Every structure is written in C-alpha cells, then in structure tokens.
Amino acid sequence: RYNGYSSDMARGVAYGKVDAEKQRLLDTCLEAWRAGMSALRPGMTGAEADVAANEVLKREGYPHMAGEGRGCAHSTGMDPEEEIPVVGPDSQDILVENQTIAFEITLLIPGYAGTRVEDTVVIRKDGPESLTNHPYVCNWYQD
C-alpha cells in the first residue's frame, strides 16, 4: 500500500534447471501478457481487451486461463482486488483513461507447473503505463 492505495504484481520464478516445456510455459505467458498489454486502450470493453492475450494462448495450445475465474485483469485501488472493471471473455465493462487495473496472465499445467505475469497499470490514451518495476524473467539457479 502507498497512501492508502493498493497494487498487485506477480512473476513466475524458475528454480533449478528449466526443461523445454517449462521454458515454453514461461515464454508463452510473457508473450501473451505483452500482447494483451499492447492492446489495452480506453473505450474498449473488457471482452475486447481479453482477445489479444488469448490469441497467443490459443495459438500455443494453452487454454484461456482466467485468473481466479474473472479474466486477465481486475481493478485495483483502495483494495488490491476491486469489483470493476474486469477484463475477461464475457466482460462488458468499459476501460476508462487513467483507470488503474492489475493486468495478469496465468498459465497452469496441473500437477506439473504454473506461472503468472501481472503488473499494476494505468490505462492511457496511447497505451497502458506499467507502475511495476520488477524483472519479467526470474531464474534463481540454473546448471
């Protein structure tokens, strides 16, 4: 929290030697996140904003992973997770300039591995501005 406001961020962390499928999971998650981020603009619905990221996931054979069942973004402000707007496949919420959201992509292979990329962003007329300052790739140890 900062002056009563909350933020939200997440990174997948690879620990140890990363096999090809785990690397693909990490790479695809980041690519989908970047595609989704580049599409965010004021005036679009949450469903429209959801499309770009999920095109990457579909192309790579991963299912739509709606973070905690709500979509690939949620509002953030006084609370880390507020009700609206939602960015997801069924959302008709409208993104508004200078609105703050947490934009996230989650990928899971149950029983094997999972990862997430998430930043707190401000919706700007020319594209989103990330307020998160943390590396996107985190490898603690590799042989």
Which positions does each model-derived feature cover?
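Active-site neighborhoods and metal-handling regions in enzymes and metal-associated proteins
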Residues: 1-143
